[in-house]
Amino acid sequence: MRTAVIIGTGMIGTSIGLALRKQGVDSYLMDTSPVALRIAEAVGAGTAEEPPETVDLAVVAVPPVHVAPVIASHQSRGTARFYVDVAGVKVSTRRELDALGCDLATVVGGHPLVGRPGSGPLAARGDLFDGRPWALVPAVGTDAAALNRALELVAACGAIPVVLDAEAHDRAIALGTLVPQIALTLVAARLTEADSGALRLLGSVWSEIPQLVGVDSATSWTQVLAANAAPVVGELEKLSRDLASLLETLRGVADGDGSLAEPDGRLLEFIQRGIDGSNRVPGRYGIPTETALADVDVSVDDRPAELARLFDDVAGAGVVMRGIDISQRPDSPDRTVTISVTPRDAENLLHELRRRKWPANS
């Protein structure tokens, strides 16, 4: 990837621009807000102008309700060869893209799972995505070259790609981010009725609880919640049944004499289920361990164009990358690029890369 356009210069879009510029990618910036655009350019995320010619990739970093119309508009103008969005909802976005007649072969849904206080370009950081999971959601007809370009973007930003389908993505986001945020919001709402003494007592404790969505991001958060309502309802119904069971247990405990005693076995079971569920989440995000993949290692020198040439050759081999890792070799300026593919594709990729004079090994 040599050129990119970032459409939307909030915290995410500007951070992507900073990361791409660090990798030598010529980045152009577009935004409906002249102020945000000037700030993003000033912090070094790219050039605040439309690209003079078709770019390799357009990153659409706009609120969820605008993703499909923006992609449709830029596809009609030929802005980029491929498109990636960063919205937190995928099923409804894909449905809207299809309804607008977009070329889904060139579009890959994306969603970097990051969060930090603040919003807008001044909150951006070039290392925002380092080591963080980044969901990639190709459609059934997505070109291999489009997915490979999206994987290249994720690698350039230092994130870890997780490839899955739209339905699985939305279910995961409902369970792991939206429902916890709803629960936290409901608890926080109870604080409006707490007395001032209780609030003083809870000040430092509450600050250690994961961040409640801020007013600056409330609109986009509610858009994701509304668009993802169906899987959220399903998870809340399960949570409601668990809560009803817990209430029944606690009512039984409350009917006692209030003395300290050994914990009720059902309460221990409740806590243990939470521990067991939390322990299932891998410490390192990436392709699920049950998915068998093969790695192909390629030595790439430090010229900026070489990494782009490698990804172009991988796409030319007709192979879909399922994961990628780039590491610096300690004894030279060269990098080792580890490409994860299916075992069936590994032999073909190795043959094609060697044919194109790449030093590749499996």
From Swiss-Prot:
InterPro entries: NAD(P)-bd_dom_sf, PDH_N, Preph/Arog_dehydrog, Prephen_DH. It holds the Pfam family PDH_N. GO terms for molecular function: NAD+ binding; prephenate dehydrogenase (NAD+) activity; prephenate dehydrogenase (NADP+) activity. The keyword Oxidoreductase applies. Residues 2-283 form the Prephenate/arogenate dehydrogenase domain. PROSITE patterns: PDH_ADH. Keywords: Antibiotic biosynthesis, NAD, Oxidoreductase. Its EC number is 1.3.1.12. SUPFAM superfamilies: NAD(P)-binding Rossmann-fold domains (SSF51735). GO terms for biological process: antibiotic biosynthetic process; tyrosine biosynthetic process. It catalyses: prephenate + NAD(+) = 3-(4-hydroxyphenyl)pyruvate + CO2 + NADH. The keyword Metal-binding does not apply. Pathway: Antibiotic biosynthesis; novobiocin biosynthesis. It comes from the Bacteria. Probable prephenate dehydrogenase that produces 4-hydroxyphenylpyruvate (4HPP) in the novobiocin biosynthesis pathway. Novobiocin is an aminocoumarin family antibiotic that targets bacterial DNA gyrases. NCBIfam families: PRK06545.2-4. Belongs to the prephenate/arogenate dehydrogenase family. This is Probable prephenate dehydrogenase NovF. The lineage of its organism: Bacteria, Bacillati, Actinomycetota, Actinomycetes, Kitasatosporales. The gene is novF.
